[in-house]
Regions:
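Immediate post-signal-peptide N-terminus of mature secreted/exported proteins
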Residues: 21-53, 58, 140-143
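Sec/Tat signal peptide C-region and signal peptidase I cleavage site
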Residues: 15-21
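Bacterial N-terminal signal peptides
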Residues: 6-15
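Positively charged n-region of N-terminal signal peptides that target proteins for export
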Residues: 1-4
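The canonical Cys-X-X-Cys-His
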Residues: 108-119
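Short, well-ordered alpha-helical segments
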Residues: 72-85, 124-127
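Amphipathic, charged alpha-helical scaffolds that flank and support histidine-based chemistry
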Residues: 48, 52-55, 82-108
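Short cysteine/histidine-rich metal-coordination sites, predominantly Zn2+-binding motifs
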Residues: 126-136
Length: 143
């Protein structure tokens, strides 16, 4: 039994060591997109509540997530689908304009769905959030 264990260690230890040196695996696109969906929800409630600093934070986080997707998977599909809508959301946030925010947010959501269709994931349909899943976070502005 001991010789078998020794042979196993000799055979597989270099593989295990090599994998350990590579560092952690990058997140899967499904993990990034799950986080993007949470950011999308928070962005809506922040803008809808007029919490412009939080909305600004969430749109920046969304942009970072989309950059992660582009870095890992290449191409410019995401940029083509959501680049202009993100800019419109940023402009509405800067202007503190709820009506413009709502329209820009809806275009961003449509851009997300357009990207899903382009990547053969049309079964994933994002919409404007209808309820707040974060009962532990206030989206009201701090006075």
């Amino acid at each position: 039994m001991k010789p078998v264990l020794a042979l196993w260690l000799i055979a597989f230890l270099p593989i295990v060591a090599a994998n350990a040196q590579d560092g952690p695996a990058p997140p899967k696109i499904s993990d990034i997109m799950a986080q993007q969906q949470r950011r999308h929800i928070k962005l809506w409630f922040a803008g809808h509540s007029g919490n412009w600093p939080l909305a600004d934070y969430e749109i920046d986080e969304l942009k970072d997530g989309f950059e992660d997707v582009n870095e890992q998977f290449g191409g410019d599909t995401v940029e083509k689908a959501v680049g202009a809508p993100i800019a419109a959301v940023e402009k509405a946030i800067e202007a503190k304009d709820r009506a413009a925010f709502t329209g820009a947010f809806d275009k961003l959501t449509a851009g997300c769905n357009s990207c899903h269709r382009l990547l053969d994931h049309s079964f994933i349909v994002i919409q404007r959030p209808t309820s707040l899943p974060y009962s532990d976070q206030s989206f009201a502005t701090q006075k």
